[in-house]
Amino acid sequence: MKQDIHPDYHFITVTLTDGSSYKTRSTYGKEGANLALDIDPRTHPAWTGGNAQLMDRGGRVSRFNAKFAGFTGKKA
């Protein structure tokens, strides 16, 4: 097995949207880093069965909707 080719695997803290947190091992950041989640299993519409709108991060959803507003997908 090759030596020194794998990323550092260390403990980080993951903070959920409700403020609760847990420790896990990851290659994210450095030892003791905090990963704050925007969406987690408790708030994601796919797992909660809700019809919540997608969060528009940086206008991406708005740009997509504007670009494809007239597209119906039907062949003429």
Swiss-Prot record:
Superkingdom, taxonomy of origin: Bacteria
InterPro entries membership: Ribosomal_bL28/bL31-like_sf, Ribosomal_bL31, Ribosomal_bL31_A, Ribosomal_bL31_sf
Pfam families attached to this UniProt entry: Ribosomal_L31 (PF01197)
Protein's GO biological process: translation
One example GO MF annotation: structural constituent of ribosome
Family affiliation: Belongs to the bacterial ribosomal protein bL31 family. Type A subfamily.
Task performed by this protein: Binds the 23S rRNA.
Assembly information from the UniProt record: Part of the 50S ribosomal subunit.
This protein's name: Large ribosomal subunit protein bL31
Organism placement in taxonomy: Bacteria, Pseudomonadati, Pseudomonadota, Alphaproteobacteria, Caulobacterales
